[in-house]
Amino acid sequence: MKSRDEVLDQNISVRKHRRVLLISNRVMHYRVSVYNYFWRRFRQEGWEFSVLANELQKQNQNRVDFPFTEMPFDFFAYRKQVRAIAPDAVILFLHLKDRIIWPLAHWLKFSGVPVAIWTKTRNLDDPDNRVRNAFFDYLHNLADGLILYTDNLRRYVSPRHFSKLFVANNTINFHDFPEVLESKEQIKESFGIPFRKVVLFTGRIGEEGNRKKVDHLIDIFRELDRPDLGLVIVGSGLTEALRSRINPKNTRYLGEVHDPRNSQISRIFKMADICSIPGHVGLGLNQAFYWGLPMVTEAGKQPPEIDYLEDGRNGYMVPENDVAALRQRILYLADNDDERKRLSANARQDILSRASIESMFGGFLACAESLASARRHPTKS
């Protein structure tokens, strides 16, 4: 009598479309547009793409087009769902602390279902932690494929695993950004922004101990006596302590901005002249570059997206926690229109060439094709 996994493998062989399943922790709002794009493109390539996750970010206002199942983490429930989907390949997008990753990854391997891990390869806030890195390295060895946020992360992977690396430069779906026809001045007027030039900060402020360092910008503008230059802060989690330090003459806090078409946040980016996220730039860098905003940030523990920044070409990187240098670079760009325009043009050109949604999809497709082609006959489980 055939096991359920043998039936799963037999069903796969007679289907017209192959199936790739992404198993994720919380799906953030900015990933929804990405997965919608993946779903459409995978279908064009003869694949069915679906997502299984423990939750969808509550603030999400984007329409979910891709097949999506939301259910709390439970190994037995997830095993049942995987069997029902019968994927040709599974991609895990989970943290080490998501305990389900351990039984799930081993069961997938034991069942003969090829499994890849979408990974930063290390906790980049603590990249030299030997204990944590041992767990990362174990997963690198266990997986049939590794999808990296950027190529630079291969430095954390053993050369013996290079053959199973696939690079999918992390990005957002620029195709879903609306065209903004209003002028900078019209947008400023609608938001009540009186400044001739705007420095923009965006991001989740309270995340992991203010790692984006918005306080550095607040302190710069607290001491700045220039009515022509202002700071606009967008994001959740600004504490009362930080709010109390804001200079109301030149700083505006707009809070968290979400809307179904990304129109409001796109208008905010268009009205700005410079983007500064002093720490942990994340995908805010991609969004800033798309709108032609040079980035001014600090060295230190930065995420993979920092690879898109080239100091002096599309932005500036100053020494870590050097607030004086951060201030100097911001003011230099604000006062030198030609230099700002040069960096602006480079920023948009660079992000479109290095971090398009199609190139990101290409990394996922290449991984799925490789996993499916090397699929083993499952053993009983």
Where are these regions (language model features)?
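A short, histidine- and acid-enriched strand-loop-helix "catalytic/donor-clamping" loop
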Residues: 113-131, 142-145
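Conserved acidic donor-binding segment of nucleotide-sugar-dependent glycosyltransferases
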Residues: 311-323, 332-338
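A short, well-ordered alpha-helix in the C-terminal region of glycosyltransferases
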Residues: 325, 332, 339-353, 360
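Short hydrophobic beta-strand element within catalytic cores of glycosyltransferases
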Residues: 294-303
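Acidic donor-binding loop of glycosyltransferase active sites
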Residues: 267-283, 293-294
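Conserved donor-binding/catalytic core segment of Leloir-type glycosyltransferases
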Residues: 21-23, 193-212, 218-222, 231-232
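Donor nucleotide-sugar binding/catalytic pocket of nucleotide-sugar-dependent glycosyltransferases
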Residues: 141-183, 193, 201
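Nucleotide-activated donor-binding/catalytic signature segment of Leloir-type glycosyltransferases, i.e.
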Residues: 240-260
